[in-house]
Amino acid sequence: MKFDPTSPSLNIMLANPRGFCAGVDRAISIVERALELFSPPIYVRHEVVHNRYVVQNLKDRGAVFVEELDQVPDNNIVIFSAHGVSQAVRAEAKARGLRVFDATCPLVTKVHLQVTRASRKGIECILIGHAGHPEVEGTMGQYDNPNGGVYLIESPADVETLEVRDPNNLCFVTQTTLSVDDTLDIISALLKRFPSIEGPRKDDICYATQNRQDAVRNLSADVDLLIVVGSKNSSNSNRLRELALKTGTQSYLVDTADDIDSSWFENITKVAVTAGASAPEVLVQQVVQAIAKLAPSVVTEVEGRKEDTVFAVPAELR
């Protein structure tokens, strides 16, 4: 289907902030620097960030992505992904003599430390997150006290059926790719059932997740369609799409410009484009160019919250 070239201009509104966050920037930089300083192959446990384009680019430069450490030969370099790993994985790497560079996002590490402290004190810990996500697996793997317990919940319904040892000795943490709004109802249910439960400090919330969701929320009411640039296995990218759908705005998740379907734009005059925290800006610009070919278009950068957070790479890689 082709658009009538005489049709009204399509207003393409670019959300801000969008795309790479400081944790993703740092993780990619760690792999790039390791490839520059040491001879390939450089092994990376799990996709360093959840973006197909980024992973393929690093593969082409000599990175080898594996799911488990038994795929890494002894005495080699291994990089842990931005999502973090369990204590058991760290112990295995040490026992195998692997040289580790840790690309775990510092905000994920803060959550890990909370769980570790809870384990040490025997406080039972509840994690709000999505089963099967590597960050969740790594976070739950920080708890090793057999006299306590760590539990995963995904919804208010899970709170009602949750069985704990001591309802007066509880804390909770959240997956970093969930925003305040994502967890609001679950936390309310936790506080109602366990009034003495302790939660994380507000400054432990991932700024990037919240900022990108706020930008989508602010734009959704003013557009007919939202395009999210991100891979299907990217939790935060999926949340952006879901947020738009909840507000009544049609939304699609695209990995690249090749995924754009012209039928989505029938009778559309305003479209917003954003990107998950692991999607590079080059993909955003390619998507914008693909949309602009469908009809006479005007591209507008929408003002949003400024981000200046930077996380340093390990000293050995500087």
Swiss-Prot record:
UniProt pathway annotation: Isoprenoid biosynthesis; dimethylallyl diphosphate biosynthesis; dimethylallyl diphosphate from (2E)-4-hydroxy-3-methylbutenyl diphosphate: step 1/1; Isoprenoid biosynthesis; isopentenyl diphosphate biosynthesis via DXP pathway; isopentenyl diphosphate from 1-deoxy-D-xylulose 5-phosphate: step 6/6
Cofactors, names only: [4Fe-4S] cluster
Residues binding dimethylallyl diphosphate, per UniProt: H50, H83, H133, S234, S235, N236, S278
Protein name as annotated: 4-hydroxy-3-methylbut-2-enyl diphosphate reductase
Residues at the catalytic site: E135
Purpose of the protein: Catalyzes the conversion of 1-hydroxy-2-methyl-2-(E)-butenyl 4-diphosphate (HMBPP) into a mixture of isopentenyl diphosphate (IPP) and dimethylallyl diphosphate (DMAPP). Acts in the terminal step of the DOXP/MEP pathway for isoprenoid precursor biosynthesis.
EC identifiers of the protein: 1.17.7.4
Gene Ontology biological-process annotations: dimethylallyl diphosphate biosynthetic process; isopentenyl diphosphate biosynthetic process, methylerythritol 4-phosphate pathway; terpenoid biosynthetic process
Amino-acid positions noted as binding (2E)-4-hydroxy-3-methylbut-2-enyl diphosphate in the UniProt annotation, renumbered to this chain: H50, H83, H133, T176, S234, S235, N236, S278
Pfam families in UniProt: LYTB (PF02401)
Residues noted as binding [4Fe-4S] cluster in the record, renumbered to the chain: C21, C105, C206
Keywords assigned by UniProt, alphabetized: 4Fe-4S, Iron, Iron-sulfur, Isoprene biosynthesis, Metal-binding, Oxidoreductase
Keyword 4Fe-4S applies: yes
